[in-house]
Amino acid sequence: SPCIIIDYLCVTETCFCERFKTNKELLEYITVMFTGVQNLLDTLNLGIVGVAQDYSDYNERVDTVAHETAHLIGAPHDEEGPCQDT
């Protein structure tokens, strides 16, 4: 079956990076965030393995990345999809 690969480039401002004492701490944070995104995508049963500005906490940030990833693969908002009148 065809496979879709989505690569991410995470760009942050200095004040975000200053929250972490080492690059290892930053990497661990990003890894946990994308694990959360993967967990949310798995609940959609889309078979997905796998640029939003976001100033929210961890849980909201995971939701935002998962939401924007769904748009990358063509998912519309609920009110914009083919089932909007049902």
Swiss-Prot record:
Gene Ontology terms: biological process: proteolysis
Protein name: Venom metalloproteinase
Cofactor field: Zn(2+)
Organism in which the protein naturally occurs: Tityus serrulatus (Brazilian scorpion)
Co-factor note (free text): Binds 1 zinc ion per subunit.
Reported tissue expression: Expressed by the venom gland.
Active site: E68
Lineage: Eukaryota, Metazoa, Ecdysozoa, Arthropoda, Chelicerata
Record-listed E.C. numbers: 3.4.24.-
